[in-house]
């Protein structure tokens, strides 16, 4: 654990303000506004992922039209290409990509460990071989922060020691948690622009709730502008995922934003909001819109090698490549206000499921249009969640949400969601 003590630790400047507007009277859900240097962000929020400063299937003008106020870039990829020198020369990632709203960047640690087989983690940092030329490289907490300072993102993440929650090595999980705390201290020391970039800490500890509590206490003591819960969405059981989120939000301060990293499936989000989380990100809504002509047989939400022409709708997902949609002349989602679904007399394209079926498998425009719909759907869903919290109707929202997906058949409601929501006062199985 770090040797920095509370008495010697200086207060960290903040480039954000966090206004709380409403809290659900039953669950831990909250409606807030996060004021950042490039605009105000309504919470809870889903953040689309523009990995390499480009969102798959959308221009930034189209992303603006969805109402998005905060999206992600990837520090690891931008550090490799275009590289730090180019980022410094152009004046940061906002100017590089022509995006005048907020950016959040991860630290690069997750990519080091998850994408590179030859990565080695030591106290110094993460050693790996460049995927471009095979040369040895080292990512330290200091270098990660330096890269993010050059990127100029509104929210930057500490470099943490990432290990899969499914790892059986408890000693390694504890080591990663302790090291993440020490690395946070190094990130804080290196951070040059706290008056315009907000450094978030990342809670680690695997599925061990005592380690999570310990990490929360250590991270909270360092008083970063916001807090992330990391190391989840890595194959753990949903019941365990919910326990970790619930445990952490019980400890984390009410007056700071809470970000659960890597979460993007609608069912996961609505439950995590009830457990007290505010911010979410995932590549799934854009990835699932893209169809490659490969054999099917795997789950597009978990197999990164398969991408499908799927539309996210209130009843789950529509696999528009299926022949059953070839003569379905309804919009992708009834009542959706995205430009694809909106009727022509309301300024939309008025596209049908039949047309999307026709172009999804062969035309790149199909992936483009589905991505517009999926991102719009996710952001619109977050708006409905927020309004339900403000109206103190979030419990009713949850019941309708799961009823819509499972066509009113409560026997099909996922047990993990039923159990997690019962723990915060919502019984999905009770008679309405």
Predicted regions and their residues:
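Non-catalytic, usually N-terminal nucleic-acid engagement modules in DNA/RNA processing proteins
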Residues: 1-193, 318, 323
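C-terminal extensions of enzymes
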Residues: 2-35, 41-50, 56-57, 160-167, ...
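Glycine-rich phosphate/ribose-binding loops and adjacent secondary-structure elements
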Residues: 2-8, 178-181, 190, 194-335
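Conserved, mostly hydrophobic/aromatic
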Residues: 39, 71, 106, 148, ...
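Alpha-helical packing segments of well-folded alpha/beta enzyme cores
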Residues: 144, 176, 180-183, 187, ...
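Structural signal for hydrophobic packing residues in well-ordered secondary-structure cores
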Residues: 152, 184, 188-191, 223, ...
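Glycine- and acidic
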Residues: 165-170, 174, 226-233, 365-367
């Amino acid at each position: 654990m770090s040797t920095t003590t509370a008495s010697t630790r200086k207060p960290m400047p903040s480039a954000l303000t966090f206004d709380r507007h409403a809290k659900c009277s039953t669950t831990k859900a909250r409606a807030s506004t996060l004021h950042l240097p490039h605009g105000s962000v309504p919470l809870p929020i889903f953040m689309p992922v523009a990995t390499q400063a480009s969102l798959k299937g959308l221009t930034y003008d189209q992303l603006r039209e969805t109402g998005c106020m905060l999206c992600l870039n990837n520090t690891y990829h931008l550090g490799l290409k275009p590289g730090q020198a180019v980022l410094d020369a152009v004046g940061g990632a906002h100017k590089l990509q022509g995006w005048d709203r907020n950016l959040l960047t991860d630290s690069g640690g997750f990519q080091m460990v998850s994408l590179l087989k030859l990565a080695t983690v030591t106290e110094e940092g993460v050693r790996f071989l460049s995927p471009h030329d095979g040369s040895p490289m080292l990512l330290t907490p200091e270098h990660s922060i330096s890269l993010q300072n050059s990127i100029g993102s509104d929210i930057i993440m500490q470099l943490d020691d990432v290990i899969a929650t499914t790892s059986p090595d408890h000693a390694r999980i504890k080591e990663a948690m302790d090291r993440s705390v020490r690395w946070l201290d190094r990130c804080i020391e290196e951070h040059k622009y706290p008056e315009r970039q907000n450094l978030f800490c990342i809670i680690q500890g695997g599925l061990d709730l005592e380690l999570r509590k310990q990490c929360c206490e250590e991270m909270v003591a360092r008083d970063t502008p916001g807090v992330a819960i990391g190391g989840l969405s890595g194959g753990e059981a949903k019941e365990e995922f919910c326990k970790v989120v619930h445990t952490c939000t019980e400890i984390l301060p009410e007056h700071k934003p809470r970000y659960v990293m890597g979460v993007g499936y609608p069912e996961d989000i609505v439950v995590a909001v009830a457990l007290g989380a505010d911010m979410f990100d995932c590549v799934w809504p854009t990835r699932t819109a893209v169809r490659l002509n490969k054999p099917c047989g795997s789950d597009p939400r978990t197999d990164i090698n398969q991408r499908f022409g799927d539309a996210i709708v209130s009843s789950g997902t529509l696999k528009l490549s299926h022949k059953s949609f070839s003569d379905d002349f309804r919009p992708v989602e009834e009542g959706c206000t995205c430009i694809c679904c909106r009727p022509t007399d309301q300024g939309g394209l008025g596209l049908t499921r039949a047309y999307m079926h026709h172009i999804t498998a062969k035309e790149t425009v199909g992936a483009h249009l589905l991505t517009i719909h999926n991102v719009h759907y996710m952001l619109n869903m977050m708006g409905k969640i927020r309004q339900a919290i403000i109206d103190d109707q979030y419990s009713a929202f949850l019941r309708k949400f799961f009823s819509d997906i499972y066509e009113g058949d409560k026997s099909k409601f996922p047990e993990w969601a039923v159990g997690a929501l019962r723990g915060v006062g919502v019984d999905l199985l009770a008679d309405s």
